[in-house]
């Protein structure tokens, strides 16, 4: 009976060691992919057009001025309201990785417009939406830490920079939070 606490302690230490090894192996397993994505984001962040102007503007959320996504507007809309984080929006989009692999697209659906709350998306996507008006069409580039981070999804590796062609079609649920 005196050996039971020692055995339990040993099991806990082994589980902790295996968990740490798994995290390290994921970090190491995707080392090249992580560097490729970071380099891609940096290259796009530093890219300029023929006039020497930035191709992408940095868009930061009000809650974290040190974080940002990149946005290049193709078409400016005629809307006057910006969606809030709690708003419901209608959008069309195509998402792909820095190697050109498409991981999602609304254009594969019968009705290409999808409706969801800004708050139900990855942080970078919500940042973009809350800085658009109806009719805006743009390309956004989201660094991995504002996307899925180290999460592994079926079509998206950990540490992936996400690129979207995005159009805000409507704001069917513009919600203003009421202060108590």
Language-model segment annotations:
Residues 2-10:
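Sec-dependent signal peptide recognition
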Residues 4-5, 20-180:
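Cross-family detector of peptidyl-prolyl cis-trans isomerase
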Residues 11-12, 152:
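Hydrophobic alpha-helical membrane-insertion segments
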Residues 15-19:
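C-terminal motif of bacterial Sec signal peptides marking the signal peptidase cleavage site
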């Amino acid at each position: 009976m005196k050996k039971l606490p020692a055995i339990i302690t040993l099991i806990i230490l082994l589980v902790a060691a295996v968990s740490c090894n798994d995290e390290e192996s994921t970090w190491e397993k995707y080392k090249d992919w992580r560097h490729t994505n970071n380099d891609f984001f940096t290259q796009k962040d530093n890219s300029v057009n023929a006039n020497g102007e930035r191709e992408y503007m940095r868009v930061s959320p009000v809650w974290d001025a040190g974080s940002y996504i990149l946005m290049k507007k193709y078409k400016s809309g005629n809307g006057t309201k910006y969606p809030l984080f709690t708003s419901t929006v209608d959008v069309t989009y195509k998402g792909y990785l820095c190697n050109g692999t498409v991981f999602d697209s609304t254009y594969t659906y019968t009705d290409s417009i999808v409706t969801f709350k800004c708050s139900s998306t990855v942080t970078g996507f919500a940042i973009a939406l809350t800085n658009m008006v109806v009719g805006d069409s743009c390309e956004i580039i989201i660094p991995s830490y504002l996307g899925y981070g180290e999460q592994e999804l079926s079509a998206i590796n950990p540490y992936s920079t996400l690129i979207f062609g995005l159009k805000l079609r409507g704001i069917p649920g513009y919600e203003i939070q009421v202060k108590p």
